Design a protein with these regions (language model features):
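N-terminal pre-Walker A segment at the start of P-loop NTPase domains
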Residues: 1-17
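Hydrophobic positions on the alpha1 helix immediately C-terminal to the Walker A/P-loop
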Residues: 40
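Accessory nucleic acid-recognition modules appended to NTPase machines
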Residues: 57, 192-340
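Hydrophobic anchor at the beta1->P-loop junction of P-loop NTPases
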Residues: 29
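Conserved catalytic segments around the Walker B and adjacent sensor/switch elements
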Residues: 50-65
């Protein structure tokens, strides 16, 4: 999509606007790959231009682009930032760093820029490792996080209208949304085969870049079995002991509980899965075990199961969960007796 044609996602822009000029706070946008974080940054930049900020003071650094693929250390990142900010003029500068988690131990540098003042910093990242270092744990680190999701159904219709595609809500269009999910780029692809290929490629990149490679998983086949299980059983109550028994007796795969827990945490950190805890409505206490796991996008299920038919119950539940999370709610599964 051309940079002049960006669908503005007001839900997230409205959360960021109060902090546009806050050079004492680092704005962190997290979410699964291809959910629209880069376009959100460009929307912020467009609004800054509309407010009269000079182009020289709006600086982008996309670490997934070819010219920055070799930037992997804090020193290399520092030199890259110095280079792109060399022409910045007087007044507040706006620094946008996309996919910053590609650089190991980036936090001290970003905090140093914040402490120097005069620069409003925006970061994006595709996983929870982004918020696990000095940015959070050191007293000097101050940040505000905006969690981003793929398109909700209303956003999906809004983007189709923006692109000049049929956008009147209908059972057929809603079924298409449930099946293919809300990865923004897929909404502009009319051909069904091309759209499926795009979603499959996105999911493959997520697993390769944010899970397998980054965490150096030794037994990839075992990890694949685990991730397949959780993707195929999304929105269902999950008991780790039952998962271990299933893998052992049904797929003849042995796995230790700590290994299963580790792999599950990796899928959560990569924003592929979201854990929804159980809550007892009678005692008003959180319950241990039986948590549900929802997909970041229902298109992940379709991409990993080429000929599978969508099951409306779990899909509707998943869409409702991500819709509520995107609106800023904390969600749990309420239980009273045997009912939920």
């Amino acid at each position: 999509m051309a940079e002049s044609k960006i669908y503005r996602r007001e839900r997230y822009l409205s959360r960021l606007r109060p902090f546009y000029d806050a050079d004492d706070l680092i704005k962190v946008i997290t979410g699964i790959r291809r959910c629209g974080k880069s376009c959100l940054l460009r929307s912020v930049a467009d609004e800054l231009r509309d407010c009269g900020v000079p182009e020289s003071n709006i600086v982008f650094l996309n670490l997934d682009r070819r010219e920055y693929r070799s930037v992997r250390t804090i020193d290399q990142l520092g030199r890259a930032i110095d280079a792109v900010m060399a022409d910045a003029g007087d007044g507040l500068r706006y620094l946008f760093v996309d996919e910053v988690q590609n650089v190991r131990d980036f936090e001290p540098l970003i905090n140093a820029i914040r402490e120097d003042g005069g620069t409003s910093i925006f970061l994006t990242g595709s996983n929870s490792y982004l918020l696990s270092g000095d940015l959070v744990t050191k007293p000097t680190g101050r940040y505000v996080e905006t969690g981003m999701f793929t398109l909700s159904y209303s956003e999906y219709l809004g983007m189709r209208k923006f692109l000049g595609l049929p956008a009147d809500s209908s059972p057929l269009l809603f079924r298409e949304y449930l099946t293919n999910g809300g990865f923004p780029r897929s909404a502009s692809i009319d051909d069904e085969q091309a759209r499926s290929a795009y979603i499959h490629d996105v999911v493959a990149q997520i697993f390769d870049k944010d899970v397998r490679t980054k965490r150096k998983i030794k037994d990839v086949a075992l990890f694949d079995r685990v991730q397949s299980y959780f993707i195929n059983n999304y929105a269902a109550p999950t008991n780790l002991s039952n998962v271990i028994d299933y893998l052992h007796h049904t797929e003849n795969v042995r796995i230790k509980r700590e290994t299963l827990s580790k792999y599950l945490k990796l899928l959560e950190d990569a924003k592929i899965l979201y854990r929804c805890p159980r809550f007892d409505l009678k005692s008003r206490r959180m319950l241990r075990g039986g948590d549900k796991f929802y997909l970041a996008d229902t298109g992940i299920y379709t991409a990993c199961n080429a000929n599978a038919q969508i099951s409306y119950g779990p899909a509707l539940e998943n869409v409702l969960y991500t819709h509520l999370r995107a609106k800023g709610y904390q969600v749990s599964v309420g239980r009273i007796g045997r009912l939920e």
